[in-house]
């Protein structure tokens, strides 16, 4: 499959021998090659643009909004697509309470399975008077055939980071950890590149955007144990202990990493956060079902017609 931007032309079953024709006809002359276009199975009509294909027609990209569109190793391209605009809004015109209210009003629920309200989790951590506090991203994607988190980490790491910085501001945390399985070397490399770029631009570290708020991020590589996808086992792993679940209560929002208040969200929840802040809770709530607004990402694998996200 080949996608050509900015036109959004989708070619299927592309072979190396087709490349010269694609360069000559589509890239240089702006012509579509109908024999490579997707064919609608009932009417056998060629649909060269991906947004005309019924499979994609109703999809709304929020967490995946930049994947495939920008260079994931370029902070400048992320900024050119409204990157870090939400963080700027938060640090210049919103209090932590404003952020918590917006997130709760949006109705965003955890995309990891439990479906707990994201804003409420942040509020629990905010209420705790114990310091320091930690914002943690669970990127230990261990389910067979699942590659939703990996696609975001590899394709748009700055969206995850921006969401985590906003979460840190809302809950009063100064340090964040991204726990990523070692089987995702490209994701880890791009995360580390993005962190270095954010430091260089003053978007991570001390006194971000001269706001008085400081926050930093570290990447922790997991050793591949499936159980470390459970948040308390994940905390033990970060602390250098055996990755075994802890009894609850106390819950992580009260006594989490190193027995300090900690907030856990998955990659998808953090990646959606900047768009919620930028566009507003009402915009997000208008998408999807009433009790669980927004979008969800599904990995489709196996013996089916359309594999992917």
Task: Annotate each predicted stretch with a short phrase.
Residues 1-309:
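Feature of Fe-S/electron-transfer and energy-metabolism proteins
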């Amino acid at each position: 499959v080949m996608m050509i931007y900015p036109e959004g032309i989708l070619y299927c079953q592309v072979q190396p021998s087709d490349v010269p024709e694609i360069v000559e006809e589509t890239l240089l002359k702006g012509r579509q090659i109908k024999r490579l276009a997707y064919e609608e199975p009932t009417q056998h009509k060629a649909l060269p643009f991906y947004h005309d294909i019924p499979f994609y027609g109703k999809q709304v990209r929020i967490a995946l909004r930049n994947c495939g569109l920008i260079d994931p190793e370029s902070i400048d391209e992320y900024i050119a697509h409204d990157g870090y605009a939400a963080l700027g809004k938060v640090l210049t015109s919103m209090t932590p309470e404003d952020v918590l209210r917006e997130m709760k009003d949006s109705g965003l629920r955890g995309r990891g399975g439990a479906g707990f309200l994201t804003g409420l989790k942040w509020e629990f951590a905010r209420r705790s008077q114990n310091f320091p506090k930690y914002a943690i991203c669970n990127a230990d994607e261990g389910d067979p055939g699942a590659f939703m988190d990996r696609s975001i980490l590899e394709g748009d790491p700055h969206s995850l980071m921006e969401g985590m910085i906003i979460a840190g501001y809302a809950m009063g945390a100064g340090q964040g950890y991204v726990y990523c399985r070692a089987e995702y070397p490209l994701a880890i490399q791009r995360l580390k590149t993005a962190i270095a770029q954010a430091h260089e631009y003053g978007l991570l570290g001390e006194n971000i955007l001269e706001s008085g708020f400081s926050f930093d991020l570290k990447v922790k590589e997991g050793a591949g144990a499936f159980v470390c996808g459970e948040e308390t086992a994940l905390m033990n792993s970060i602390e250098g202990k055996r990755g075994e679940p802890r009894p609850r209560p106390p819950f992580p929002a009260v006594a989490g990493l190193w027995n300090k208040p900690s907030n856990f969200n998955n990659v998808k929840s953090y990646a959606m956060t900047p768009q919620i802040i930028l566009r507003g809770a009402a915009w997000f709530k208008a998408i999807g079902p009433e009790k669980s607004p927004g979008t969800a990402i599904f990995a489709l694998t196996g013996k089916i017609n359309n594999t992917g996200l």
